[in-house]
Amino acid sequence: MGVIAAIKPNGWVDKTVSMIASLGVAIPGFWLAMILVAEISLKLNWLPATGAKSFSVSPWEAIRHALLPGIAIAAYGMAEVARQLRGSLLEVLSSQYVRTLHAKGLSMTRILWQHGLKNVSVNLFTIISLLVNRMLAATVVIEAVFAIPGMGSLIVRGAIQRDFPIVQGVVFAMVIVVIAVNLIADLLCAAVDPRIEQ
């Protein structure tokens, strides 16, 4: 969405994408989760409101149960990525060297994929790594709303029952995920922009 908005700034697509992205950033995940449960599950009865199914037992049911929690967790991240990508791409596409590439006869698609996205990818990897960390924290609340037996509900149950080894184990697992994601993001940034290695 951010790429589409950046290609034609100030058009109706850009304004629509910006409005949706602003809403996605502004709405808290737990509130969006409750709206999804009330409207899509209880009112329309399209998807299940609570629980989770194993993918090995029933792939279709597993997808149906994971859809609403996935939307609730990912909405903020998708909106933030769209906003940041739009802003970064607008800056790159309005730069002098992009005008030179246009003058040389390169198509907009080629400029976008070979030059534009490459230049904004460092920002993109950094934002995504930060959003993964935020999503880990959001799972605690989202799992409570959808009654999903996951790491978030496990750490809450462990804290309530004062089961400190469980809490330490979950925190340790989350720390490993955060470190791994940040390391991968740093390696990708260094691969895209060799100046970062120096």
Q: Over which residues does each language-model region extend?
A:
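Alpha-helical transmembrane segments of integral membrane proteins
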Residues: 1-13, 29, 42, 46, ...
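N-terminal signal-anchor/first transmembrane alpha helix
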Residues: 12-26
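Transmembrane alpha-helices and their membrane-interface boundaries in multi-pass membrane transporters
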Residues: 27-35
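Juxtamembrane non-transmembrane "cap" segments at the membrane-aqueous interface
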Residues: 35-42
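Short clusters of hydrophobic/aromatic residues that line enzyme substrate/ligand-binding pockets
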Residues: 47, 52
